[in-house]
Amino acid sequence: MFMGASTKEGREIATKSREIVRSLIGDKIKHLKPEEREIVERIVHSTADPEYAELTRISADFVEESSKAIKEKMDILTDINMVRVGINRYEGEVKCYINHPLTYELSKEQEITRAAAAMEVAL
């Protein structure tokens, strides 16, 4: 199942979407490991911005360490609710502080985005 597609029509749409993404970025990510290509493909698909194929950097141990963290059900921290809601089958806790009262206060005080303030509040 790709991107939550569970019906035949949904799978066909998802397959076509994946083909379009691969046609746009395939050459730019061919040097990556298969797991890393999958990550970048999903980023490009969800943002609808092929430029992320060139902007995304994946550290050498990212796939291994993130897989370990997921297996251990460690908390996931995100700066926006759309991502929090999209992580809907995770057994650990997914946290987002974008609407926390301190986030609003901090963003005004420091004249920073709420997303940046949310990360400060979380830490």
Predicted ranges, named:
Residues L77-L123:
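Conserved mixed alpha/beta catalytic, RNA-binding, or beta-rich assembly cores of soluble enzyme
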